[in-house]
Amino acid sequence: MNLEVEIERHSGFCGGVIRAIGRAERFLEEHSGETLYSLGDIVHNEAELRRLGGKGLVTISKEDLGNISKRAFDGKRRFDRLVSLSNHSDRSHSRSLSLSKRTGQSNNNSQGATLLIRAHGEPPETYSLAESLGLTVIDCTCPVVLRLQKSIREAYERLKPAGGQLIIFGKIGHAEVLGLLGQVGGDAVVIENMAMLLSKIEDGGILTDRPLEIFSQTTKSPVEYSLICEELSVRATAGIKVHDTICSQVASRHEELAEFALRHDIIIFVSGASSSNGKVLFELCKTRNPRTYHISEAAELSAGWFSDGDKVGICGATSTPGWLLAQVAEAVKGFSGR
């Protein structure tokens, strides 16, 4: 069986994920033996999480923050006791100061562990909690998300005096959306799709006779967002302001993948099971090419999917590492000659 294999050239990590993983790896290289705690998965890809876990990155939830603070305190207390016995307390003080300098963060309590905020961003209370626990924070919030958070705060300040409403198109419970809600104390309406929009209007959750402003989670479908905004514009009687907040890198991927899917006989889409962006892009490929298969790793490939002479396209989400795409491509090539 002869197969022609091509990896879509723009597939792989987006800029925000590259930045977050780069900073995590740099910290782990410079602080050998130390643990770096990521608040939530740094990327929604199981294979990449295993790779980073091998280097010392530990994923935790918000409920774990108090525990890592206590572990860091206990470890520091034991360290100080040993240093005191050796008459090297000055060296311990210097080490604590240099830790804050190397991470680029100020920290009044050098006893804390180091916490990484991933590209999705966090609500303000997360930073307050980390500070109260004495944790050193490495903030890897994507610059695109930071701008969106700022825009949402400003919109809320405009809308509140006029009794208006803030609407967010995004996945309920998604880390980025939770971070956005946190900017306005949760006082916004989140809609996941057109059906939810219509339902909210019907039951009074969205008041179309008041000023409205709508934003999108940065990784959502541009086409779906456009349709939702059009529907709202027709119904809003007191005016609506639509904000273009989908990441340009994500938006361009939709057009590129649609074209890529059409010019191949079969598409192998690679992404983690929990990737929201992966679900959206997989469905996009599937609508363009029915012979589209979703896998998380090369071991899930099946020789029965392929036919002699197939042009095989391999692509992935913004959370799919390039090394994994290359691994899948090599595995597909291995079916040739069978």
Role assignments for model-derived ranges:
Residues 1-81, 99, 107-338:
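The feature marks the mature, well-folded catalytic cores of soluble enzymes
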Residues 83-87, 93, 98-106:
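Short Gly/Ser/Thr- and charged-rich N-terminal loops/segments
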